[in-house]
């Protein structure tokens, strides 16, 4: 998984970056050369550009902590609506992060969900996590943090150990 790693990264953040124990996954690039297939994604910015990333990935990860994570991410596959989602489960909580597109590939048509599932006082409690929209998807803040980290002003948003866990 190269291009579609973002949902796994987000789920690992919520899970506390546990160490992976087993990974079962499959990537697909069935539609990568078909420029007319569903939506504007995957099209090179220049005429001679290369399209050499996956178009979909599905997988299941078990961690040494006993937590599990399943994911479905794509920008082009045979389905009703494009969906990018990850579900995670542990002993104290579970959750789901999902982006469902009304028009494939167009972020402005997407519906975002982020939910946390817990037990409180013997009752199931489902919480929707609502955040302010961020048009740059955190890119400006991440770049600022990188500079501030080098300057010694801030701690990094992501550590090298977290990046290594993500790549495993």
Task: Describe each model-derived feature in a short phrase.
Residues 2-9, 137-144, 161-168:
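A structural signal for well-ordered alpha-helical segments within the folded catalytic domains
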Residues 23, 98, 127-128, 157-159:
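Short, hydrophobic secondary-structure boundary micro-motifs
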Residues 47-57, 62-142:
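NAD(P)-dinucleotide binding in Rossmann-like oxidoreductases
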Residues 64, 130, 145-168:
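C-terminal helix-rich "cap/oligomerization" subdomain common to oxidoreductases
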Residues 1-68, 73-80, 161:
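Rossmann-like dinucleotide-binding domain that binds NAD(P)(H)
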